[in-house]
């Protein structure tokens, strides 16, 4: 299984590729204050960071269709039961418009959803809250 991992930070975007449990690519892209200042809102950074990820994949010789899944670092979501969730349109809308905290981790799921949109991944994008996560059967829908 090949997994793309997206981890946006306040001034960087980290991209990793895992094949089964082994990291085969890891890159950190630093964003200058000037680059980030061009974005009026946090969500305005989405294209900038998405393009960084696509550049990283190109550098590593991959395209989105090569992945079985995309894992996205967290996001400020409402309290949820422990488990694995699918990043769907409702979750993306929540992170963009309803999340009580405008945090850079909200971008990860939005970017993952955009990257996966229209692609035939065997597993839809999933959020994770730590570096140790697992895929499970029976994905839960994001609650309202």
At which residue positions do the language-model features occur?
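A structural motif corresponding to the C-terminal end of an alpha-helix
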Residues: 110-123
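Long, well-ordered hydrophobic secondary-structure segments characteristic of membrane-embedded
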Residues: 72, 108-111
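Glycine-rich anion/phosphate-binding loops
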Residues: 46-52, 99-107
């Amino acid at each position: 299984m090949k997994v793309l991992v997206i981890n946006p930070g306040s001034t960087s975007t980290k991209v990793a590729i895992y094949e089964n449990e082994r990291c085969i690519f890891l890159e950190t892209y630093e964003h200058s204050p000037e680059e980030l200042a061009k974005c009026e809102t946090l969500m305005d950074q989405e294209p900038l960071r998405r393009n960084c990820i696509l550049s990283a994949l190109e550098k590593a010789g991959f395209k989105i269709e090569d992945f079985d899944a995309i894992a996205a670092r967290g996001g400020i979501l409402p309290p949820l039961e422990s488990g694995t969730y699918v990043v769907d349109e409702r979750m993306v809308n929540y992170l963009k418009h309803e999340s009580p905290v405008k945090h850079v981790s909200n971008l990860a799921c939005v970017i993952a959803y955009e990257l996966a949109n229209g692609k035939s991944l065997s597993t839809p994008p999933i959020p994770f809250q730590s570096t140790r996560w697992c895929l499970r059967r029976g994905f839960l829908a994001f609650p309202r």
